[in-house]
Amino acid sequence: MKKLIASLCALSMLLCMVGFDGAESVSDQEAADAVAEMIDAIYVQSRTEETDAQCAAAKEAWDALTDAQKELVEGEEASPDYFGLDTGDASLDDPRNADDIGEKEILVVSFGTSYNDSRVADIKGIEDAIQAAFPDWSVRRAFTAQIIINHVQARDGEFIDNVDQALQRAVDNGVKQLVVQPTHLMHGAEYDELMESVNAFADKFEAVAVAEPLLGEVGNDATVINEDKAAVAEAIVSAALAETDYATMEDAANDGTAFVFMGHGTAHVAKVTYSQMQTQMNTLGYNNVFIGTVEGEPEETACENVIEAVSAAGYKNVVLRPLMVVAGDHANNDMAGDEEDSWKTMFLDSGVFDSVDCQIAGLGSIKAVENLYVAHTQAAMDTLSK
């Protein structure tokens, strides 16, 4: 309640600052700081009864600023890009938060992204594919990142359920059979947290099944590969080649070109999955493919180590592409951004390579990947009847 009162007070003060003739004069920076404080208040990974009002108040306050004041918005997390960055048309998305679900639901759970175009192409793309494959089931959406949910809600007025909200919606609508399909890559921390939430609601349904994440079981070490990893490896390689003039990876290698697929990385034991994907690429004969991660977990996937590996292998041209379901902030900024710590910049600044190109596309927009999610959903459904 204190945060809500503070936000409403900031909004009231701001409207007085910029909205009424004869109001006490304040600096542009003070007006911007008031909005930054409101943005920081909703940049949190927890939802409260105050969240909806805080999101609405932050947007109203932002809209009341002049263009010059908007450029001055800076906080612990706040920046002009929070409301000002154009990431595409949110109206093309479907939050899939409607009631009238029926008795059979597929809940597609994603981390989420505030990039509208990517959300439509990648997350909605997967959801649409699953809905088309199972027309007798209702597909609904949940995001695990409340920070992203709040961002999209405040900026675009799009309301997306978090996992607990989505599960409660299913209960309230009388769902009897529930299949949960995570779009996460692996059995990592996000998957573990999802399982905790699902288990807390499990006794509310007649039957519940949780499908495999994209890359399937983790395995014990870097040598463990499986059909899911092979399918994803083939899919991303095919998609990457399609955006070049090369017909095959062998052609690219002969021309001195390497492909670096950048994942997120994790300190979770599941980080071995990235090492397994490198093993999978090598097993398929894609020796000019290198797996990296933003977080540098596992260690060999850190940017500087990947640069060293690509250089040692003798490649002079590099294509960077995200190994992520969504091409959101990490793809646009950590990978392809112009900042000094982006992967593109670090590869260029190494002075080793003749060219560094970026492909910004998520796994979710690749048809073969969508089909793999459909297969995982079907496998989970099959367990309901056993």
Region locations from a protein language model:
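Sec-dependent signal peptide cleavage junction
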Residues: L15-S27
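Beta-rich interaction/scaffold domains
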Residues: E24-S91
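Hydrophobic helical h-region of N-terminal Sec-dependent signal peptides
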Residues: C9-L14
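Extended amphipathic ligand-handling, pore-lining, and cofactor/metal-binding catalytic surfaces
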Residues: V26-Q29, D81-V319, M324-K386
